[in-house]
Amino acid sequence: MSFHAIVIGTGVDALVAAHLLARRGKQVLLVEERSPAIRDFGWVPSQIVAELGLALEVEAPDPWAVALLPDGAKLELWRDIGRSSQSIRHYSERDAQKWPGFCRRMAALARLFEQLYLEAPTDPLNLRFALGVRGLGREGMVDLMRLLPMPVTELLDDWFECDALKGALAAMGILNIQQGPRSGGTAFRFLHHHVGSPEGVFRPPRTELSTRLRQLARLGLYFKAAETKKILTKAGRARGVLLGDGEEIEAPIVVSGADPRRTLLELADPGWLDPELARAVGNIRARGVAARLLFEGPANGNLVFAPSLDYLERAYDEIKYGRVSREPYLEAHSSPRGLEVHFQYVPQGAKEDFGDLAATARRLLPGLENAKLVSILGPADLERDEGWPQGQPYHAELALDQALWMRPLPELSQYKTPIEGLWLCGPAMHPGGGVAGAAGYNCSQAILKEKI
């Protein structure tokens, strides 16, 4: 059987790209070595859901965060802005009054990025981008220009005084990156994780989009559970894949959901790349910084242990020296499997007994004292089980120099590689992790414009 395209699948973006190409009448083979178990994290744009022809359930937890404090107190943040203000008022009357204005201004900035995230990355001098910024008005333009490079600590200190509120919000600026809240660019990452969420909600949803797409039969789409050993090339052009069992399958288009380093330096022949580009690909930063713990037991809501900005900065200090944080940032979410706990920071190759992580989680999160631990996955385990390079779920760190029109490199930002017919669609591509399926959507649209 002949195929128009082969998609190398390692996650939601590869699934979205494969389904959308098949929906446009292409014969597509999706080669997937593993079926990741972790739920998809991030905004799923309604445009993608509509084009896939899905009815997708998106969780809407309320409160969306319960910020825990060391003394046992808690700050509940609700989807209703007024109700959150009432909660904040117990800690600061001033912050309660400022909360609605903060939510309004962050939502205005996030809406600009919603437009940018569903298309190939735009050059900052592009007229449409400039008009979008102009549409923010003077106040919004100042907010955007100040926010992009600044540490999230400065953004939040400008608005609030309550440590618990600032810590819970700042956590989205350091999620899955080896930086602390005082690092430059963390305010941009805070905003990135707000894109697509309702005004006043600063946690992206979780969905079962990948699971639904694996279950969805589509004319022209074929699945094969196999390891991709090589991307075959001839005269500088992709011509198919070599599987782990030695089978060769040909197609004029190969779309890789694997990270750029693995795709271009291991699966494909790097000899087809300019040496400077090959060096730059090898230097893309993709460091995992977290472990995932799963506990059995009853649901405990959406818990955050990030009691202050200073606490988060101290947690980050440990990983700089290759150590697991003894006082970590924790984020816990109920799921059909139990309570999933994000434990940050855990460096790649950490030597500590992972049993200590469970003890720390039990100490800091209520209700886990007698809960059975099901599993602990460190960065190396997440690379093996989920296909995340070095345990980095975004395949390339979402730092400001690896974002937007520079994601993951300016030379690769349009999803096309220098090897003719080879495309990149994984979360290392614009807009990055935290927007489920958008990179796969954008890549598929770029391929279809080539009229394959």
Model-derived features: positions:
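N-terminal glycine-rich phosphate/pyrophosphate-binding loop and immediately adjacent elements
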Residues: 2-118
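Hydrophobic residues within alpha-helices
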Residues: 17, 209-212, 443
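Active-site/ligand-binding neighborhood in enzyme catalytic cores
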Residues: 107-220, 225-226, 388-397, 401-402
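A glycine-rich dinucleotide-binding beta-alpha-beta segment and adjacent secondary-structure elements
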Residues: 162, 166-179, 327-329, 366-430
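Mid-domain catalytic core of redox enzymes
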Residues: 199-206, 227-337
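Hydrophobic, well-ordered secondary-structure elements that form the walls
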Residues: 255, 295, 341, 360-361, ...
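C-terminal segments that line or cap access tunnels to active or ligand-binding sites in enzymes
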Residues: 298-386
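A conserved FAD-binding loop/helix module that cradles the flavin
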Residues: 427-448
